[in-house]
Amino acid sequence: MSWKLDKQFSDKICNFSHDFFNKKLIKKGKPISGEWTVLATLVLVVENTSSYEIKQVLSLGTGNRCLGKSSLSNQGDVLNDSHAEIICKRSFQKFCYNEILNLLQSKYYNSILFNIEYHDSNNNNKDNDNNGSLPTISIKKGHSLHFYVNQTPCGDCSIFPFKKETQPENFIEKEKLEKDGKDKIENHEKKEQKDIIKQVDKDKDEENYEDEESKRKLKKVKDDNNNNNNNNNNNNNNNNNNNNNNNNNNNNNNNNNNNNNINNNNNQYDDIQRTGAKTVFGEPEDKKLIGVDYHQIGVLRVKPGRGDPTVSMSCSDKIARWNVLGIQGSLLSHFIKEQIFLSSITIGDLFNHSSIYRGLIGRLLPNPTTTTTETSSSSSSSSSSSNTIPNFKLNSDLEIFSTNIQFQFSKLLLESDQQNNNKSTSSGLAISFCYPNQHEVTIAINGKKMGTNQKNFNAISQRSSICKFNLFKLFHQLVLIIKNKNSNEENEKNNQIVLIDSLFNYYECKHLSKKYYQEYEKLKEFKFKNWLTNSSDLENFVLDN
């Protein structure tokens, strides 16, 4: 049976991910009592004509914080975004580099995911890696990648309506609690900035550090518990029907119906699930009115910050971009034949099928359905023409699944525990893992390895293995091996690898991936015009020659 037809597939992916976290990862970096975090995994599934097997967790990430603009580095030596989804994606990229290196170094190496083929400078296929042969990497037939995250990604996916009558607290009191929490954070900001290095040395002090998003959503998640469990059950049924029919039109109808419910039948709903992610410049701003009109939907957002604003796009926006550009990124696109797309995404807490479909797929379609003036203007602000068919490849076949199985360190589970009378906080650490056994813990508030202090902050040894600089080093290792295998004079005249080998500038090497950036420019032109990009000053770092 295909995984698409298995009604228990999402629960199997969830359990496989949880078991891996609990049994295969060491304790280092995991939340302590009273702490919560977000978990994301990328799982390999291998399918044949009659069955499938959930094979391996290829990468994993935990975390829910990111750096403010003033904390970014122009050396590529810190992790800017430590949300679990992004840690998982960067860990997967590290896995890709390692696998390709192994394939290049040994013709006997059997990759768990990739095939390697060789061709000459005229793109003619060759049987082996003799001189003059260039490698092309592709995913093995029947192999697919499946993303799991234990709660809805921040940003557009997490905005959906609900009925106030299902909530255990008075709405006005809840709003007051949210405001009080935000004020307390702002009052303590200066003190915490001074103590930042001291805090990272002691795990127990991490509970005193919490960003605006964490504080705000603790109240909201607790309120939305009952309502969203109902949403999960309903949407599980919808998803199973969609899978059995394998019909994307059902997804479109679900998304359109949800938009109509929000905007045309406001009496059905009292409020909207809120996100701390802020709209980017150029997008319509949130109206912040009472009830369902608080947020705009379908717009680009940045992750919330604490006084120091961030320039990291929301996870909803980043995953949507993966549905066009792939999860391999620009540098790996030099070697990998086609974009690497996710086949499915399974989400736990705060699941709402329509909002997730809208955030990841619907708003990228040629004519996304909008039913209010404000939402329509949002769509046009991110699109040069809503009637123009985007000339880019969209992963519209992405399957969206839900699961009611909760992660043991989820915020929703922690807040619903009636025996927990202590204040809950988000973990200040982020775990990254990539297959087969590379495990690392970083400090989310400074983007460096666990154990970093004031004295060793700038030490090379304290850089994360998945920071830009270190992934760039892996990229150049690939380039050097390919160049050495491709040393005849004719190929050196025509080979872009030789050109790349002469460049040690991160920004320049990224932008040499012409196919990737052609797709990226199309995406910006037609849909994501206001996407925030890093200043070139932050990406002009170089490797030692």
Curated annotation (Swiss-Prot):
Its cofactor is 1D-myo-inositol hexakisphosphate. Keywords: Hydrolase, Metal-binding, tRNA processing, Zinc. PROSITE patterns: A_DEAMIN_EDITASE. 1D-myo-inositol hexakisphosphate binds at residues 89-90, 318, 321, 468, 510. The keyword Hydrolase applies. Zn(2+) binds at residues 83, 154, 315. Residues 59-541 form the A to I editase domain. One of its GO terms (molecular function) is tRNA-specific adenosine deaminase activity. It catalyses: adenosine(37) in tRNA(Ala) + H2O + H(+) = inosine(37) in tRNA(Ala) + NH4(+). Residues 171-270, 368-388 are annotated as: Disordered. It comes from the Eukaryota. Specifically deaminates adenosine-37 to inosine in tRNA-Ala. PANTHER family: TRNA-SPECIFIC ADENOSINE DEAMINASE 1. Belongs to the ADAT1 family. This is tRNA-specific adenosine deaminase 1. It comes from Dictyostelium discoideum. The lineage of its organism: Eukaryota, Amoebozoa, Evosea, Eumycetozoa, Dictyostelia. The gene is adat1.
